[in-house]
A protein has these predicted regions:
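Glycine-centered beta-turn/loop sites at beta-strand termini
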Residues: 41-44, 49-51, 58-59, 68, ...
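Sec-dependent signal peptide cleavage junction
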Residues: 23-36
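N-terminal secretory signal peptides that target proteins for export/translocation
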Residues: 1-7
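Short, low-complexity, Pro/Ser/Thr/Gly-rich segments in the mature regions of secreted, periplasmic
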Residues: 177-187
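Extracellular beta-strand-rich, repetitive "passenger/adhesive" scaffolds
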Residues: 145, 162-163, 168-171
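Long, distal/terminal scaffolding or interaction modules
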Residues: 35-38, 83
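Bacterial N-terminal signal peptides
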Residues: 12-24
Length: 187
């Protein structure tokens, strides 16, 4: 049942993104637990808005969609196939286990995917990408990025800027494309 609200809401970008949750339970919308830095929601659709700055946000053991704000965010996806978006600010994103997608956005970000077959997008500015275990894809995009694949057959796309791959190993199936500034093979 939909309720009408006559209250004027003034909110940050993070809060506005979740006003749709008043219309349908989040568990029915995408099958993800939706969590933002500074605002969180459970699978049943309740919304908790916090007025203080949140520096650390943790996901659940299921699939999570975690959205950062325009400030430096630290997010931990935990287990499950998670989507973590840092957006603006110098963010630290940790996917942990599962097939995760990490997106840095603007700012100098540090992105750690963990185990699983992950996809990591650096975004804008100078970023550090660490894939970990699994067959991963690392995209340097803009900025001068440092890309570390780890175990598994990894794909590196250096993108714009002067990107460096620090552990390239073609014997385990690593491949690369685009203009990499430097490719250092694992010894």
């Amino acid at each position: 049942m939909l309720k009408e609200f006559s209250t004027r809401i003034i909110a940050s970008v993070c809060t506005v993104m979740f006003l749709f949750a008043l219309l349908m339970p989040l568990s029915e919308s995408w099958g993800y637990n939706v969590i933002t830095a500074g605002c969180s929601s459970s699978g049943g659709g309740s919304i908790i808005l916090r007025t203080s700055t949140i520096l650390r946000t943790e996901g659940t053991n299921g699939p999570d969609l975690m959205l950062g704000c325009n400030t430096p965010d630290t997010m931990y996806g935990k287990s499950g196939s998670d989507v973590l978006q840092g957006r603006s600010g110098d963010d630290m994103l940790y996917g942990d286990s599962g097939d995760d997608s990490l997106q840095g956005g603007e700012g100098g970000d540090e992105l750690h995917a963990g185990t699983g077959n992950d996809i990591i997008f650096a975004g804008v500015d100078d970023d550090f990408l660490v894939a970990g275990k699994g067959d991963d894809e690392l995209y340097g995009e803009e900025g001068n990025d440092l890309l570390e694949g780890g175990d598994g057959a990894d794909y590196f796309d250096c993108g714009d800027g002067l990107d460096v791959i620090v552990d390239y190993d073609p014997s385990k199936g690593d491949t690369h494309t685009n203009n990499c500034e430097d490719i250092r093979e694992r010894l």
